[in-house]
Amino acid sequence: MDLIKVVCGIIFKDDLVLICRRKAEKSLGGYWEFPGGKVEDGESNEESLLRELIEELNLKVKIKQHFFDTVHQYDNGAIELISFICETENIASESTDHDQLQWVKVSDLLDWKLAPADIPIAKKLIEEFKG
């Protein structure tokens, strides 16, 4: 089974980070995740992330740096999740793929029902941003 390459944005506004709850009818419905999506052929990871955030959230961000990559095996295949630290001046208010958006403290991320692939990124974030 092929490895699907997916990008996500760890989007900061002030000291809060954006997480989004997947719509019930989507795979992993009800789970929270960092927003993003699949990398399309011919796109760089960064181009994919900027496109996905505009498509899903109508949100323009500034990518600050690559953060962390993780591979997760789901029942129907594996994804490589590539995360980037981003900043925004805007506030996303609605999403095409999510039914709820929440700005949360990094230290509180593991209190949410995160998608399994997002948990290692959340743990690394908490480690990096504590204190």
Q: What would you call each of these model-derived segments?
A:
Residues M1-D2, I126-G131:
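Generic C-terminal helix-cap and adjacent flexible tail
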Residues M1-V17, K38:
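Conserved N-terminal beta-strand and adjoining loop/helix that marks the start
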Residues K26-G30:
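A conserved beta-turn-beta hairpin within the catalytic core of GNAT-like acetyltransferases
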Residues F34-H66, K105:
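The catalytic Nudix box helix
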Residues K60, D69-A92, Q102, V106:
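Active-site-adjacent beta-strand/loop module that shapes the phosphate/pyrophosphate-binding cleft
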Residues I85, E94-L125:
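NUDIX/MutT-family hydrolases
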